[in-house]
Each structure stands twice: as C-alpha cells, then as structure tokens.
C-alpha cells in the first residue's frame, strides 16, 4: 500500500464504472500515484493520517484508533458516503467496525465473513468463513439468506443453491446444531438443497455453503 490499492481503484473505475474513494494519507497517495504515473481520474481521496496495525487489539479501533484509514473509511460508509468498503486489514478490527460503526441490518444477529471461493465449475460463497466461533441455528439461516442475496445480486446466480456443510449428506447427520439448522433451512426462503460434505465443495455442488 498504497500502490496496489491505487491500481485496484483505477481498475474498478475503468472496468466497473464506479466512483472510488481512496482512504489514507493523502500526501502519500498522491506521491505514489505521481511516481508510478497512475491517474486518479474517477477517484476521490479521504484523508486518514494513520494505519491500524494488525497486531492491535481489534476493539481498540473504536476509541484509540479513530484516525486510521479503516475507522475513517467505515465511518464514511455509515454516514452514507459510499455503498461498500474494501479493506485488506485486520479481519477482527473490520468486524468490530462493521458491527459498531457501520452497524448491522436490523434483525441480523451476527456479522459474517463470506469469501467467494473457486471450484472446478462456478465459484461458491462460504458463510461464515471465520468471524464467529459459536453460532445458533437461526444465525446460520440468516447467513444463508444473506449469502443467497449476495450470489443473486452480485454474482448474478439465479436461485442460488444453499447447502449446509456437514459430516454426511443425510439429514440425520451432525450435532444438534446441524440437525436443527437443517430443519430451519428447509423452511427458510432460500433454495436449500440439503447437507454437503467438504469433499464435494471443489466440484461446485452448491452456490452458498453455510
């Protein structure tokens, strides 16, 4: 940073037709762009003098590190100055910011990490990918709904297939969490196709895996 961030922003402007706001030290961003002959057309700069160190306690983002690019960017998102926030920083701090700065959609119990992963055919979305140590069935149902919405609206997948990651394909497999989640997912407003084993993931057997 900031070279690769500027390059990524420039590509997003050219290929996606979006307006990009670069959040960081404005002087360093402009100097880097000039040195590498990168245009800043279609990009705005929101000055943030500091960077959140990955070794810091994630919760310190809110009070001790409000001047960092991560905190400033997420506050801008909360204030309606953007529609999405892209960050390669601390996952823990990002989740703290998402929960307490940006805030969750009303009714959503937990924020989640949702990486889109490649397969032999089409990519799938894994949710949650590591944000939560312990979940309840209703949370997995919410993850399924959010994941389906993402795959449908962003990845343009019609009726995304939702599967529950489990130790076996049969609906009687798993712990109480998986058993109850299966029942609730079957009743949820998603295209639930049942359990899926880890060995099936590379073949693209589902579009959303919870």
Model-derived features with residue positions:
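Short coil/turn connectors at secondary-structure junctions
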Residues: 16-18, 40-41, 79-83, 90-91, ...
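Glycine-rich phosphate/diphosphate-binding loop of Rossmann-like nucleotide-binding domains
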Residues: 16-30, 133-198, 207-208
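Short glycine/serine/threonine-rich phosphate/pyrophosphate-binding segments
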Residues: 1-8, 67-80, 84-98, 109-113, ...
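N-terminal glycine-rich anion-binding loop in soluble enzyme alpha/beta folds
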Residues: 2-56
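Phosphate/nucleotide-donor binding subsite
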Residues: 38-82
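Short, acidic/small-residue loops that bind anionic groups at enzyme active sites
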Residues: 96-130, 187-196
